[in-house]
């Protein structure tokens, strides 16, 4: 059987209702069609998934059409697991085209992007084995490369919030590959063919060896976002409009990023988030959950300055400053003069701070308007009420 050409939008709604009413049907939380890159040695191994479009808690009518098109193409869709992945074929595309018939003419620009995907596939003579569709029915641990990539896309496209996507086990699913431009190569393939490739001049220029691709290999940033070195941002990072990532010591890991215009000249580790208007100075490090924070994810507030080569392993509020070269961790002993403590309390009326002069860093986490410094005579870390406004150059963001 096949889907008969749908004549109207009302008929389309009827089709969707029929599909979603079938026994056991589950509405996916996310889905998309990807072109996959397979291993040069092992063609069954998927190395990368390129999604021209992902759907995240949206476009459920298109999901129903894709499920029906799979079923009519003799593919049994399994709704029982947390995800379902299948290779699509020309029969699937023909069925989807028939279902989307009322929308084909108007599927241009920003309209009906899922229909545009199907229209593009329909123009290809033979889609072969390299196009896969994935449905996520719940945010469980990913089980496939396609599912990992769909979630990374959701983060980098700002469809999902940072720290709110389950990526447990992703490292074990992705292969460590040599990246040549946007093409992944199996390392074993390069080893086995090294002699021939080097002698005949076909050995590729390897840009990196990693399990994750670069952000710019998959995502087009906002017009006012600048990334001066592609290697500085990993796929799965999330960059708000107006973010500038300078060359040198900067780096943004997956599941980390910015919430507004931010100057990034330092390192934002996995799970770390930086608020709008903040400045991560040259070589400054914001620790991730695996690098010294005891599993406590670090959020940096708005209009906060992290000085060059500083290390921050403590959540900071708005309007804070960490001086260059110092380290602020949960266990760091911090001296606060009585008069400065009163000013900090005034800026943070909900904070419960004891009247003492020595605090552990964790007692100050998330507080606003604190300037962390080091006494150059004693070496003590001190804190005082910040009196300096942190403001980015609007022309640069």
UniProtKB/Swiss-Prot annotation:
GO terms for cellular component: cytoplasm. Succinyl-CoA binds at residues 267, 282, 285, 308, 323-324, 331, 360, 373-376. CDD domains: LbH_THP_succinylT_putative. This is 2,3,4,5-tetrahydropyridine-2,6-dicarboxylate N-succinyltransferase. Pathway: Amino-acid biosynthesis; L-lysine biosynthesis via DAP pathway; LL-2,6-diaminopimelate from (S)-tetrahydrodipicolinate (succinylase route): step 1/3. The keyword Flavoprotein does not apply. Catalyzes the conversion of the cyclic tetrahydrodipicolinate (THDP) into the acyclic N-succinyl-L-2-amino-6-oxopimelate using succinyl-CoA. The lineage of its organism: Bacteria, Pseudomonadati, Campylobacterota, Epsilonproteobacteria, Campylobacterales. Homotrimer. One of its GO terms (biological process) is lysine biosynthetic process via diaminopimelate.
């Amino acid at each position: 059987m096949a889907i008969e050409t749908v004549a109207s939008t009302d008929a389309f709604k009827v089709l969707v209702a029929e599909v979603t009413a079938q026994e056991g049907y589950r509405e996916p939380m996310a889905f998309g069609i990807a072109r996959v890159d397979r291993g040069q040695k092992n063609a069954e191994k998927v190395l990368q998934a390129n999604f021209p479009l992902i759907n995240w808690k949206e476009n459920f009518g298109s999901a129903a059409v894709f499920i029906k098109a799979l079923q009519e193409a003799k593919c049994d869709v399994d709704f029982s697991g947390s995800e379902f992945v299948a290779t699509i074929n020309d029969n699937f595309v023909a069925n989807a085209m028939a279902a989307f018939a009322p929308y084909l003419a108007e599927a241009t620009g920003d309209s009906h992007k899922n229909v545009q995907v199907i229209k593009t596939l329909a123009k290809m003579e033979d889609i072969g084995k390299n196009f896969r569709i994935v449905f996520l029915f719940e945010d469980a641990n990913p089980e496939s490369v396609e599912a990992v990539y769909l979630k990374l896309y959701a983060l980098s496209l700002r469809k999902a919030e940072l720290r709110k996507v389950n990526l447990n086990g992703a490292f074990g699913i992705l292969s460590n590959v040599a990246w040549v431009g946007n093409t992944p190569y199996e390392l074993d393939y390069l080893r086995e063919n090294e002699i021939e490739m080097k002698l005949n001049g076909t050995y590729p220029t390897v840009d990196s060896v990693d399990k994750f691709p670069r952000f710019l290999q998959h995502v087009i940033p906002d017009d006012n976002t600048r990334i001066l070195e592609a290697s500085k941002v990993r796929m799965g990072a999330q960059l708000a409009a107006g973010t500038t990532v300078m060359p040198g010591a900067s780096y943004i890991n997956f599941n980390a990023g910015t919430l507004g215009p931010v100057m990034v000249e330092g390192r934002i580790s996995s799970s770390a988030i930086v608020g709008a208007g903040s400045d991560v100075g040259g070589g400054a490090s914001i620790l991730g959950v695996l690098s010294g924070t005891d599993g406590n994810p670090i959020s940096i507030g708005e209009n906060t300055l992290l000085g060059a080569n500083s290390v921050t392993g403590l959540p900071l509020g708005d309007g804070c400053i960490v001086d260059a070269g110092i380290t602020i961790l949960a266990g760091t002993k911090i001296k606060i003069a009585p008069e400065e403590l009163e000013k900090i309390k005034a800026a943070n009326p909900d904070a419960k701070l004891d009247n003492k002069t020595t605090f552990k860093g964790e007692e100050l986490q998330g507080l606003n308007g604190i300037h962390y410094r080091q006494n150059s005579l004693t070496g003590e870390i001190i804190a005082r009420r910040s009196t300096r406004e942190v403001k980015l150059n609007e022309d640069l963001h």
